[in-house]
């Protein structure tokens, strides 16, 4: 008599890079015959992939761990907060195992110890798709090209959690991308901690893909991805000079004209305290140059207000810079101290919470006006949209200017579309975040 199929529940928190880690773990478990179930009650064990970047993320991770313990009782913890095992066990001493980020084998081993795999599992019958298990909709996928980061930003603890930059061989990355495209993926979202540094640790060594030599470097990676016939979107791009190399690829339609560059601030004084590059004037000149080459270029960024030592003058400098930069998509966070971050030792004056809140509100209002004006320029134009979902009100999609979950939507007045469709539309209306359109 065959043994019951072991069942695993999975909760994935945090950024897209953590989501890719979750996909890798789930793919291995499925290859070993485990069934992935969507509810706590159906699972024999639950894995929680945590985020530990800021205090609010840690609080959410602890809350979800507690929920999983209450609903199931057998919980394994992994991910970025796993480097703080004591903090997890102080609150939830009953967790079965705690592992850190990228510790895939340890997570799978911990699952084995709680719920052994089926001894009669036949991997030739229980097939896993060639692209692996994906937690995103079928038509888009995240493509992680490296782990870790070589920067030492004072507000960040990512290097201590995920280590120094380790680039994947370009042949492996391109082979994975090819499998995803063959499986029906229509948009590849390239992610890492520092996409523009890809290959630095390998000294840009030449690898092979489909028998052809390819350098392990951002430009060559993008050239190869751009030949696969799908949308390719770049995230987490540090503004090195080599970013200039990919703008012509965007202008030629090989890559989406979209750059996600986390600037964090504009004041030279604050950037110095953050240990970020302070070339804000040269950055504005580069924006101008990029837009001359590729007029459709969308630039998204994230910023932090209320960093220790930030004055009203620094904040006003940031607002003025935003006016000059005319960014399309922007996120903003109030500074939150992170345990272990170098910023805690700078001895700078903390910004009061009420001042942080006031600056955040002013920042958002300022940028919303910029974003609204830029989106209004699209009214009447025709663009291509990738449909994400369809409901009774119509279809919801995204343009080249919209990454999933963090940017805006394009609401299309049609009931004849389905997720994964690409459709040409005419923009009829806009607000500060979203567009409305009708099929052409």
Swiss-Prot record:
InterPro entries: Elp3/MiaA/NifB-like_rSAM, Methylthiotransferase, Methylthiotransferase_CS, Methylthiotransferase_N, Methylthiotransferase_N_sf, NA-bd_OB-fold, Ribosomal_uS12_MeSTrfase_RimO, rSAM
One GO process term, biological-process aspect: tRNA modification
Main location: cytoplasm
Keywords: 4Fe-4S, Cytoplasm, Iron, Iron-sulfur, Metal-binding, S-adenosyl-L-methionine, Transferase
Cofactor binding note: Binds 2 [4Fe-4S] clusters. One cluster is coordinated with 3 cysteines and an exchangeable S-adenosyl-L-methionine.
Location(s), subcellular: Cytoplasm
GO cellular component terms, semicolon-separated: cytosol
GO MF term set: 4 iron, 4 sulfur cluster binding; aspartic acid methylthiotransferase activity; metal ion binding; protein methylthiotransferase activity
Record keyword Metal-binding present: yes
Binding site for [4Fe-4S] cluster 2: 149, 153, 156
Domain TRAM: 376-440
Co-factor requirement: [4Fe-4S] cluster
A Pfam family recorded for this sequence: Radical_SAM
Class of the enzyme per the UniProt entry, highest EC level: transferase
Catalytic activity reported: L-aspartate(89)-[ribosomal protein uS12]-hydrogen + (sulfur carrier)-SH + AH2 + 2 S-adenosyl-L-methionine = 3-methylsulfanyl-L-aspartate(89)-[ribosomal protein uS12]-hydrogen + (sulfur carrier)-H + 5'-deoxyadenosine + L-methionine + A + S-adenosyl-L-homocysteine + 2 H(+)
Domain MTTase N-terminal: 6-116
Binding positions ([4Fe-4S] cluster 1): 15, 51, 80
Classification via Gene3D superfamilies: Methylthiotransferase, N-terminal domain (3.40.50.12160), Nucleic acid-binding proteins (2.40.50.140), tm_1862 like domain (3.80.30.20)
Domain Radical SAM core: 135-373
Enzyme Commission code: 2.8.4.4
Family: Belongs to the methylthiotransferase family. RimO subfamily.
Primary role: Catalyzes the methylthiolation of an aspartic acid residue of ribosomal protein uS12.
Name assigned to this protein: Ribosomal protein uS12 methylthiotransferase RimO
